[in-house]
């Protein structure tokens, strides 16, 4: 069924009869449908996060249920060939990278945020499902790449993109000890990706936008999702222990940087590299 949906979403003959506001509405509609389809893993996972009772179900804790649900979604996507083994390996890497960050950020000396519920599948205070929140970002980018027939123009040399991604990840740890170099990294990324353009096809015509803008927009929607996650008490920041408060807006920049790091991993997949044009300058 999803295969037929994907075919319907991606295979369109050129519509020369569409102009003006009619074309805008059709393209905007298909853009929204493709975005929703690309968010399949993330969407189902967050729906489960909001629907599973805080007290759990059938004697199984909420965090354990979320892990079972996340693994089931991932297995189903692989079984129905919505993701390849190569992509699953990358998503597993996102899970491990995210879990390591979660473990550090929730450790006794740091306590940037916490997971208040009990569970059998918690390691060092972090439930195993937490890594899937990062994997969901990777899954979204992989699915969007195919559905929108993404192509990247004027991408910086891969080694520079990898260096930037590593620096971003390391700074998430080291800023607790030697200062936060986030804005220096933002400046570096602005220079690195200033000319990089992403080409995407919402319906039958290719459009383009700055890649940096895509990072910022995706980061914003993750920030919104994080607000919902803390509202439902799945995890919480120190300022939310007494009563809920919105996640600080500064987290938006952190998520945008994490999206950039995730993009770098996805860009190194074999079947995606051929869609990327590396700048020769």
Question: Where are these predicted regions, by residue range?
Answer:
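Aromatic-rich, lipid-facing transmembrane alpha helices and their immediate juxtamembrane interface loops
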Residues: 1-281
């Amino acid at each position: 069924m999803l295969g037929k949906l994907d075919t319907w979403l991606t295979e369109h003959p050129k519509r020369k009869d569409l102009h003006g506001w009619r074309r805008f509405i059709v393209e905007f509609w298909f853009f929204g449908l493709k975005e929703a389809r690309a968010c399949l893993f993330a969407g189902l996972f967050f729906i489960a996060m909001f629907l599973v009772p805080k007290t759990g179900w059938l004697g199984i804790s909420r965090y354990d249920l979320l892990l079972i649900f996340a693994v089931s979604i991932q297995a189903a996507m692989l079984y129905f060939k919505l993701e390849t083994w190569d992509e699953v390996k990358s998503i597993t890497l996102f899970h491990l990278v995210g879990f390591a960050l979660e473990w550090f950020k929730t450790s006794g000396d740091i306590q940037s945020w916490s997971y208040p519920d009990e569970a059998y599948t918690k390691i060092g205070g972090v439930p195993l499902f937490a890594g899937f929140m990062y994997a969901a970002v990777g899954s979204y980018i992989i699915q969007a790449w195919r559905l929108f027939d993404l192509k990247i123009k004027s991408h910086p040399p891969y080694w520079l993109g990898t260096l930037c991604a590593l620096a971003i990840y390391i700074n998430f740890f080291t800023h607790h000890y030697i200062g936060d170099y986030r804005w220096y990294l933002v400046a570096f990324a602005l220079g690195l990706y200033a000319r990089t353009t992403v080409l995407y096809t919402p319906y039958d015509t290719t459009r383009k936008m700055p890649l940096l803008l895509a990072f910022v927009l995706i980061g914003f929607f993750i920030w919104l999702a994080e607000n919902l996650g803390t509202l439902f008490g799945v995890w919480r920041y120190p300022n939310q222990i007494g009563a809920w408060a919105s996640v600080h807006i500064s987290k938006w920049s952190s998520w945008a940087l994490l999206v950039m790091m995730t993009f770098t991993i996805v860009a190194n997949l074999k079947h995606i590299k051929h869609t990327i044009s590396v700048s020769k300058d």
